[in-house]
Amino acid sequence: MTNIQTQLDNLRKTLRQYEYEYHVLDNPSVPDSEYDRLFHQLKALELEHPEFLTSDSPTQRVGAKPLSGFSQIRHEIPMLSLDNAFSDAEFNAFVKRIEDRLILLPKPLTFCCEPKLDGLAVSILYVNGELTQAATRGDGTTGEDITANIRTIRNVPLQLLTDNPPARLEVRGEVFMPHAGFERLNKYALEHNEKTFANPRNAAAGSLRQLDPNITSKRPLVLNAYGIGIAEGIDLPTTHYDRLQWLKSIGIPVNPEIRLCNGADEVLGFYRDIQNKRSSLGYDIDGTVLKINDIALQNELGFISKAPRWAIAYKFPAQEELTLLNDVEFQVGRTGAITPVAKLEPVFVAGVTVSNATLHNGDEIERLNIAIGDTVVIRRAGDVIPQIIGVLHERRPDNAKPIIFPTNCPVCDSQIIRIEGEAVARCTGGLFCAAQRKEALKHFVSRKAMDIDGVGGKLIEQLVDRELIHTPADLFKLDLTTLTRLERMGAKSAENALNSLENAKSTTLDRFIFALGIREVGEATALNLANHFKTLDALKDANLEELQQVPDVGEVVANRIFIFWREAHNVAVVEDLIAQGVHWETVEVKEASENLFKDKTVVLTGTLTQMGRNEAKALLQQLGAKVSGSVSSKTDFVIAGDGAGSKLAKAQELNITVLTEEEFLAQITR
């Protein structure tokens, strides 16, 4: 072997190791810049010496010419589907069938439990360690040849990370698109006037079925393996879990949430844990897959029809359903935004009954081409507000009514205008409009603003309807006699409300700024403003140029803030609030350059008592930290509040520095 060949082999081996650390172990040993440097060095050497180019080189992920169509590949071992369970009773019946069928029943039965990824099932064949073929599941017997596209996925190794590869190994797994990548893809599409994707699964499917692999290479796809098909020239581990860990050891990525569970109760606990974590995973799942772990028991149980007897998919409640649009109401928000709200025939979606859904704005009504009486598709995912994502136009009845966007406010009859360039139409009534007054006051007392527990939306509606309050400052002028005259307001409830109002007078500057309801000023921006200007007077007196020096404050937001303080009514309300005793302590936060958290990955867990989770997150981000939702070997700090659970345990297991809330505050303040 020549020196050049040796150099090329060493570079390829090193790059494969770095790819394995990054994509499979989630624990890179070198910065991205070092990987990029070696990658470009390898690419340059291969250009100089094309005679030594190999198809499994890290540089050869993209290179195939666009296809005219996909050829068919017949699966040597069929890719079967799974039976489904939709309740604990159905899962327990599945376990009972297994127990009745097994001759020697182990106690307890051990299951390998996995999230059910919402992507596309694929088969990837390695011959002597090199990726040679990939196919979609298709109908389970025959799929489409997507080899060129699979090669472009960054976490799929082109060469297995082992010196003794099997003669033939078929890896089966799911290709999906994480939420962050999906959002970037759609953002790019919008900026370039291209068609957006409805959801990550559609995006993954469309990306895998591109005839041009160069397009697929630009899509943020990920593979997680869930099993093995063909295996020749290798003695595989005797349990499903150990097989997945073996795949991981040779460079194949598997899902980090996989868990072994003993007995049905532990399995159901896993199901509920994953269901609770669903919205924070960063990718779509639609249930769990539960498999008997012992391969010998799998073989004894065998198959029925087109599904194995030893596995089942326990699905989450449906996130999409069909229902009827009965009417549309137009609601007025605290900034005057007019939002059309669909009134639906009640339907059970993702564990709750849905009867309302947002239609966002007039553009959305036009885009959906929706009418009253239509059959619509409702989607509810995690904590997301239910929304209409489609209309079955072929079912439109003859008596369907068009949705007419109002020209005057449905509450105060003021004119509705839509500023050019904005999607939202707004009522021009301002605080003359009772709806805007109510929503502004609800925002003021909300948990992330002034956090006034004893004063809720129903109470505010009564107070506004009876014209007992007009501004936030009026809340602090309420007395026991006034409150006890209201409906459903006894002496005890009235006292609680007054105590909450008194306690709320002591707040923080960022909470106070957020509570004022300045358009475009969210929690993070309010925190940045408070930390930049330090005092309310400095913020009030700031000009446009000074405002734009604050992180995340651009021209539009600066204008909103500047105009707010030029309105005499707003200044009068703020002065009245301070006159009523609203106050805060000045806390100076260290600059990013001199704090412990700059360029570090931080995880928050438990209940923080001195500030909200969102406040702490925004503060850490301002200090230059990356705030993550899960603990891994890349985590630098875990900030643990009261009741910290599994994240704290994992941090201790990985020897990650854990700070209490008090230690965190001591680090960030002068």
UniProtKB/Swiss-Prot annotation:
InterPro entries, alphabetized: BRCT_dom (IPR001357), BRCT_dom_sf (IPR036420), DisA/LigA_HHH (IPR041663), DNA_ligase (IPR001679), DNA_ligase_AS (IPR018239), DNA_ligase_CS (IPR033136), DNAligase_adenylation (IPR013839), DNAligase_N (IPR013840)
Domain BRCT: 592-670
Pfam short name (any one): DNA_ligase_ZBD
UniProt keyword annotations, A-Z: DNA damage, DNA repair, DNA replication, Ligase, Magnesium, Manganese, Metal-binding, NAD, Zinc
Cofactors, names only: Mg(2+); Mn(2+)
Sites where the protein binds NAD(+): 32-36, 81-82, 114, 137, 174, 291, 315
MF GO annotations: DNA binding; DNA ligase (NAD+) activity; metal ion binding
Active site, UniProt feature: 116 (n6-amp-lysine intermediate)
Keyword Cell division part of the UniProt annotation: no
Broadest EC class assigned to this enzyme: ligase
Reactions the enzyme catalyzes: NAD(+) + (deoxyribonucleotide)n-3'-hydroxyl + 5'-phospho-(deoxyribonucleotide)m = (deoxyribonucleotide)n+m + AMP + beta-nicotinamide D-nucleotide
CDD domains in the record: BRCT_DNA_ligase_like (cd17748), LIGANc (cd00114)
Keyword presence, Manganese: yes
Entry binding sites for Zn(2+): 409, 412, 427, 433
GO cellular component: cytosol
Family statement drawn from the similarity comment of this UniProt entry: Belongs to the NAD-dependent DNA ligase family. LigA subfamily.
Function, as annotated: DNA ligase that catalyzes the formation of phosphodiester linkages between 5'-phosphoryl and 3'-hydroxyl groups in double-stranded DNA using NAD as a coenzyme and as the energy source for the reaction. It is essential for DNA replication and repair of damaged DNA.
Family matches, as PANTHER family: CHROMOSOME TRANSMISSION FIDELITY FACTOR 18, DNA LIGASE
Protein name: DNA ligase
